[in-house]
Amino acid sequence: NDVMKKNDKAYVIINSTQMKETLVAFGHNEKTSNKILIIGGGNVGFNLAKNIEQSFDEARLKIIEKDKSRAEFIANQLNNTIVINGNGLDEDILTEVNLEDVETVIALTNDDEDNLMVSVLVEKFAKDLKEIDDKRTMALINKPNYSLLQSSLKIDDLIDPRMNTVSSILKHVHKGTIENAYTI
């Protein structure tokens, strides 16, 4: 039928030049974040930072990485990213990175629980600073049941690797004519 109901899925194919207008039409009117904090310097966090450095000159990136040797490696590989060796769950570390200046926090550790907790901590900090609407939190989750916690934990976006895989598959199936696939 032609009626959209709650939990229905719709696929919209558009020209990439219409992306911003389409996202706005679906209620995703978001400004570009220039001050980004990545928690976790594993492959996902490192590659995201590398991609942002190459694509967005205005971006100011910081990465918090627990493992000292990994933090040193990342610091040597990236040109315009500040790398801090520490635990993203440590409130002193979050204070040290000037969390009040950060626009978006992306938790990309290998631990779902840590990613969720970092996001909750950031929301707590933002609320304490009376900046609750100014921070965007994103957390990588591998366990599908954790998506049920998103609204109660007040996390803006959950990153589900399975959905990103769907995006990649769609791009290849349509032989490169799809630039990106988004869940909206």
Where are these regions (language model features)?
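Cytosolic regulatory regions of ion transport systems
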Residues: 1-184
